[in-house]
Amino acid sequence: LRAPLRSLRFLVPGTSGRYRCGGLLVEQQTARLLSELVPTELVTYRQREQSLPFLADLLKAEPPGSAAADQMLWIVSWGFDVPRQLRALRGRPVAYHAHSSGYGFRLPPGVPVLAVGRNTLGYWGQWASRNPLF
């Protein structure tokens, strides 16, 4: 028997105003496509939005090690915010959806990299060669 797939949570700073950009559109489209296969939701972490859950609220409600926390796979992607997001999500399943490179941070061992292109995959292959790369 196969284990059920984890639900996915895509972290974005917000979905309106100054956060509208290509990276946001990619995350929204990826979440929409994957929602046809597994439960998927966008989660904001800077701008509270009425229709979306907020990261700080979820972290309080679902402490590491709880059944709810273990059932989710968090997807982080927002360049300069990735190190802070990884610290906040320590102890939880997380993957990095890498749109580009050169942000100057190192990934902790074991964090999978989901690269959107060959150049990004090559960059992370050089700088995070022991992490799972896709």
Model-based region annotation:
Residues 1-3, 133-134:
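Short intrinsically disordered, low-complexity coil segments enriched in acidic
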Residues 10-11, 41:
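Extended, folded domain segments that form the structural surfaces/walls around functional sites
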Residues 14-26:
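A short, glycine/small-residue-rich beta-strand->loop->alpha-helix junction that serves as a flexible
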Residues 35-42:
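A generic structural motif
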Residues 42-44, 134:
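A structural preference for short, hydrophobic beta-strand core positions in alpha/beta folds
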Residues 119-120, 132-134:
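Short beta-strand->alpha-helix junction loop in the catalytic core
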